[in-house]
Amino acid sequence: MADDVGNLHSQSAEIGPVGLYLVKVVVGDVGTPGAPIVNLALTVDAPSGNVSGIAEITQAVQGGNHRFPVSGHIYHTGLGQDQLLVSLQGQFVYSVPPPAIGSFLANFRAGLAVDKTWNGHGGFDYLNTHIDNVPVKRV
């Protein structure tokens, strides 16, 4: 035990980014025809766990593209290999397709389970679209 004390200064632990940083991720089955994909550009305040940024949904259907602000929080599992649990929410204006007339605010929610490099799995939902257990990849 006494031998360990002298080595404390030379031991290192892997620590994620500190302070304020930018991260970009893609959520979804990229390459699957017609699958909705969410691109996220997020500013992370590591000390507080607050996250905010822009989400962009792309889907190869009429009215399938949306760009809007999101915000949320990051939680740490603290168990074994520490994972980041990211909760995001936002709203965007959705215009109903013709022949209907009108627009309304649509809710968006996302939940991601990522490692310190921001790779993992997650899901999101908006309107009548619910996507679970898709890849999350840092870009």
Language-model regions, residue ranges each:
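Generic short beta-strand segments
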Residues: 22-28, 54-58, 88-94
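Short, surface-exposed loop/turn motifs at beta-strand boundaries within globular domains
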Residues: 18, 33-37, 46-48
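N-terminal glycine/threonine-rich, aromatic-flanked beta-hairpin/loop signature
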Residues: 44-65
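Beta-sheet ligand-binding and adhesion/scaffold domains
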Residues: 2-11, 29-32, 39-41, 74-139
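A generic structural micro-feature
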Residues: 34, 62-66, 102
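Surface patches in mature domains of proteins
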Residues: 64-77
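Charge-rich, low-complexity N-terminal segments
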Residues: 11-13, 19-21
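Beta-strand-dominated lipid-handling architectures at cellular/organellar boundaries
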Residues: 50-52, 71, 85-87
